[in-house]
Amino acid sequence: MSQLQLLRAQDYPRMPWKNGGGFTEEITRDSGEGLDGFGWRLSIADIEESGGFSTFAGYQRIITVLQGDGMRLLVDGQPSRPLLPFDAFAFSGESQVSCKLLGGAIRDFNLIYAPQRYRARLQWFDGTSRLYSSASTVLLFAASSHVEVSMAGREVQRLGLYDCLRLEGNDELLGLEVQGRFCLIELISR
């Protein structure tokens, strides 16, 4: 049976960005210290003004706007589509990236992972969803103030805004019924 850990948003450690231009709240990671050595990491960042992103050589990134009007990224000189809330966008951590805010400040959600160590899948859902996963690590990130997660043989887990449920060591098909707006992240070791 998988190990379950409920992570509360008010407990996330706050740390400076790698480039020093802002702050990140780290939700969880697989291992490593500081800004190096992890195989994957989930975080939330507040972007108050347009500017450059940190580089993460050897990593893949998936970013999603959570709050605010959105942003447009410039990735290695190529403009992205406008990134609006709950519209995920992937890019290489090695890329030179800057953002242009479409309005005021935004809050975003980030998955950074090492593709040579993990395969990753990230999807957003809203409403009632019945899901099945055989990934060794499953993360459910709550993007609304009331998210309920039901699993066979376990009590219902209630998540508040930006809380995260981490299910680790899954060795069989995991069935979940989830109510609310949330992100499902599946990570499989290579």
Swiss-Prot record:
<comment type="similarity">
    <text>To E.coli YdjR.</text>
</comment>
<dbReference type="InterPro" id="IPR010282">
    <property type="entry name" value="Uncharacterised_HutD/Ves"/>
</dbReference>
<protein>
    <recommendedName>
        <fullName>Uncharacterized 21.2 kDa protein in hutC 3'region</fullName>
    </recommendedName>
</protein>
<dbReference type="InterPro" id="IPR014710">
    <property type="entry name" value="RmlC-like_jellyroll"/>
</dbReference>
<dbReference type="InterPro" id="IPR011051">
    <property type="entry name" value="RmlC_Cupin_sf"/>
</dbReference>
<dbReference type="Pfam" id="PF05962">
    <property type="entry name" value="HutD"/>
</dbReference>
